UniProtKB/Swiss-Prot annotation:
Organism, as annotated: Rattus norvegicus
Major location (coarse): nucleus
Residues annotated with Phosphoserine modification: S40, S306
Protein name from the UniProt record: Probable splicing factor YJU2B
Polar residues bias locations: 260-270, 307-316, 359-373
Length: 385
């Protein structure tokens, strides 16, 4: 492309190299085009880069280091034989113009107008940096022997202070000097780590296939290993320890039972029996009779009453005496009828035994609340009968 650019220039028919010399003179233009529009005033348009952070005086905005501007470059003086240049540029955030110039004596840039520097400088002596030797000091070192001796002593003391730091830097550089050995060590460590990761992945895959798991497994940690070691599925005591404990317990056990044991067991048994007897006992006289609850026994269905029983019942009824009888006559009458009453009682017992249904007794008749008594609830109205 370079040679093609030089060969592909258009030369008009009236171009005369002896008269015009170059195409720029033929077109009456400068090679830098618009950048050289103020070249007659000694000003050249260049691309200037901000050397440090500043604050614009017009808009009070921060302009960072490295921001580029189209600046007017102009020579304003010399430092010995080094020229001093000034740069004038417009702020990209406002209409303010900023002027800066070089400082060859301090190897720095100085703000002339339009901005203020963000102070981030430090002293080179405090930072233990190498300072540039001034021209007057160089001449004095060359001509004055005493000054050169004093300067040498100061340099040696500075070297003693900086020697540990320099040796540490040198050791660090020597450690990383052999690139091949470092690369081999790094690759070997990488291969070992990769192999361990592959083995761990194979174990995880085998466990997932065995337990039919579809979730990713988290890598183990030291806390997990300690917890798993505490949760093993075996007892704390071995078989021999258990047998030894059993033998010791048997040896120290008393041969005779304690006095409180049988009494307590018998008392418990008696309390249980008492509760059962209470549950089987019939209710007391305060409880209502079956007739009061509307429960009657149906005698006609269970067994027909014999005529002998009816006759005995009629005989057992006490005859009413005439109204003129006395108590003495009643006693005489009772003594005479004593054998008759005994006969009537026996006949009543026989009748009751005949009238009772199968599986029932006389106690069931006297206590109808027992489960053996066959009771039927009669809900019919007494008046209707």
């Amino acid at each position: 492309m370079g040679e093609r650019k030089g060969q592909n220039k258009y030369y008009p028919p009236d171009f005369n190299p002896e008269k015009h010399g170059s195409l720029n003179r033929y077109h009456n233009s400068h090679p830098l085009r618009e950048r050289a529009r103020k070249l007659s005033q000694g000003i050249l348009i260049i691309r200037f880069e901000m050397p440090y952070n500043i604050w614009c005086d017009g808009c009070k905005n921060h302009i960072g280091m490295g921001v580029r501007y189209n600046a007017e470059k102009k020579k304003v003086g010399n430092y010995y034989t080094t020229p001093i240049y000034r740069f004038r540029m417009k702020c990209h955030l406002c209409v303010n113009y900023i002027e800066m110039q070089t400082d060859p004596a301090n190897c720095d840039y100085v703000i002339v107008s339009g901005a203020s520097r963000k102070e981030e400088r430090w002293d080179m002596e405090d930072n233990e940096q190498v300072l540039t030797t001034e021209h007057e000091k160089k001449e004095k070192l060359e001509t004055d022997a005493m000054f050169r001796l004093e300067h040498g002593e100061a340099d040696r003391s500075t070297l003693k202070k900086a020697l540990p730091t320099l040796s540490h830097i040198q050791e660090a550089q020597n450690a990383w000097k052999d690139d091949f050995a470092l690369n081999s060590m790094l690759r070997r460590h990488f291969r070992e780590k990769k192999k361990a990761m592959q083995e761990e992945e194979e174990k995880d895959q085998a466990l997932q296939a065995k337990a039919n798991l579809a979730i990713p497994l988290v890598p183990e940690s030291e806390d997990d290993r300690r917890l798993a070691a505490l949760l093993r599925l075996h007892t704390l005591d071995s078989y021999e320890d258990k047998q030894r404990m059993k033998r010791t317990e048997i040896i120290h056990r008393s041969w005779f039972p304690s006095a409180q044991g049988p009494s307590t067991s018998s008392s418990k048994a008696s309390t249980v029996l008492k509760k059962l007897c209470r549950g089987r006992r019939p209710p007391t006289g305060s409880a209502g009779a079956p007739g009061d609850l509307g429960i009657v026994r149906r005698k006609s269905r269970e067994a027909p009453e014999s005529p002998q029983c009816t006759a005995d019942n009629s005989l057992s009824e006490e005859p009413r005496g005439p109204p003129g009888t006395t108590p003495d006559s009643k006693t005489l009458q009772g003594t005479a009828e004593a054998p008759r009453t005994s006969k009537t009682l026996e006949s009543k017992r026989n009748c009751s035994d005949q009238a009772l249904p199968l599986g029932s007794s006389q106690e069931d008749l006297l206590h109808p609340n027992t489960p053996n008594a066959s009771l039927v609830a009669d809900y019919s109205d007494s008046e209707s009968e």
